[in-house]
Amino acid sequence: MPPWPLPADPVARAKAAGLDVQPMEGTAKHFHAHLDVIVNGKPVKVPGNIGVSPAQQAMSELHTHDDTGMIHIEAPTANKRYTLGQLFGEWQVKLSAAGIGGLKADGKNTLVAYAGGKPLSGDPATIELLPHRQITLVYGPAGAKVDVPKSYNFPPGQ
């Protein structure tokens, strides 16, 4: 159940998600996306330091710095594709069409993914992270009304 904590070894989780880990952020590809998670009508914080190990002075190419939900993609290569499933793999929180973090989409409760305020079909783990893409995951009673953000106010230069 949320909130979901950070994993004990963020470097191992990042590598398991197929991501590069470096002592510095990559510079070949640099953009930001944003994630909101809503469970039973309440926001769940996306923690800072997903994909970051201050102890090992290492950082994944896909990471968070704070709990605003901003996802940083700072990669050493330009042509790699990044997905929401990779972020959740680093976070060590299960994400699939069947549910999120132990919460099952069973008909009574649903998991719906949105991009730019529009519902998406399929497995939310496959959602591609794109520049300034607003992604929202909503879990809760089927048919419940939830205000889904259409966009995020990215700081200048982000």
Predicted regions and their residues:
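Ubiquitin-like/PB1-type beta-grasp interaction modules and other compact soluble beta-rich domains
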Residues: M1-Q158
